[in-house]
C-alpha cells in the first residue's frame, strides 16, 4: 500500500518523515521557481510598455549574458539597433543614454529567463540523483524544463518579428509568448500545491471540473490581454461602461475577412477582451453558487468567495487602466493582478482535488 502511494505522488521516501521532508523541499523549490517566473513576466511587461523589447537585436543564449562593458561596446550595440525599423521610423535621434535605458529592460528580462532555467535544471538534477524524485514527478519536471526551452525560442521568434519590417513585435507572437509563460506558471504552481497537506476532503468531481475550466478561462483572458498589449488596443475606446456611447460599437468588423478583426483590429480586440472579462466574472460567480450549494461552509466554498473578489478587483483595475489610457503603473498592476487571479484559481483547482497521495 505504501509503495502504491509513493508511486502515485511520484516522490520516493524511506518512512513518513523522510517522505514529508522530500515533499517539503520539492515544494519550496517549486515556489522559488514560481516567484522567479512571476518576476520574468512582470519585467517582460515593463519591457513591452517602455518600448524596450527590440533593443537587443541578436539572440546569444550564452554570450548574451554579458552586457556592453565600455563605451565602444555600447556604441556597437546601439548601431545594431539603429538598423531596425523601430529606430528609423519611431526613435530616430535617440541618444545613447536613452538607448541604454531600454537596453537594460530587455537585458534584465533575458537574464531572468536564463536564471530560471538554471534554477530548474540544477535542483532537478540534485533531487533526481539523491532519490527525492520518482516516477511521474521526474518526467513532469523534465517536461517543464523542455517547455521553458521552447518558451525561450518563442521569445526570440517574437522579437524577430519586429526586426525587419514591423516597428513592434507581432501581436500574435506576443500573445503566444505571454500565454506560454502563464501555462508554465500554472503547471509549476499546480504541482507545488499538490504537495501540501489539506485538512479537508477533495470536492466532488463536478466542482473539480468547473474549477479547472475557470483556470482555462483565465488563461484565455490572458491571451486576449496579450493581443490588446500587442496592438496597443488599450488606447482605443477609453470609456466605460458604454463603448464610445454604444453597447456594441459599429466599427468592430471593418476588415475582411471578418475573423481578422478578432486578432488585428485594435477596437475589436479590446471589445472581446472586455466581454470575456465579464464572462470570467460570471463563471466565478456561478462556480461559487455551485460550491456553496453542494459543499456549504467548507474551505472549498470559502475559497470561491475569495476568487470572485479577486476577479472583481482585477476587473476594476482593468477599467481604471482603460479610463486612464493605460499608464505604465496601472498597466503593470493589471498584469500583476492577472497573475494573482491565475495563481489563486490554480491553487483552488488543485485543492478541490486534494494532495497527491502520501
From Swiss-Prot:
Tagged with keyword Transmembrane: yes
Protein's UniProt keywords contain Transmembrane: yes
InterPro entries the UniProt entry points to: COX15/CtaA_fam (IPR003780), HemeA_Synthase_type2 (IPR023754)
GO cellular component assignments: plasma membrane
UniProt keywords, alphabetically: Cell membrane, Heme biosynthesis, Iron, Membrane, Metal-binding, Oxidoreductase, Transmembrane, Transmembrane helix
Cofactor(s) essential for the protein: heme b
Topology of the protein relative to the lipid bilayer: Multi-pass membrane protein
Name this polypeptide is given: Heme A synthase
Organism: Brucella suis (strain ATCC 23445 / NCTC 10510)
Phylogenetic lineage: Bacteria, Pseudomonadati, Pseudomonadota, Alphaproteobacteria, Hyphomicrobiales
This protein's encoding gene: ctaA
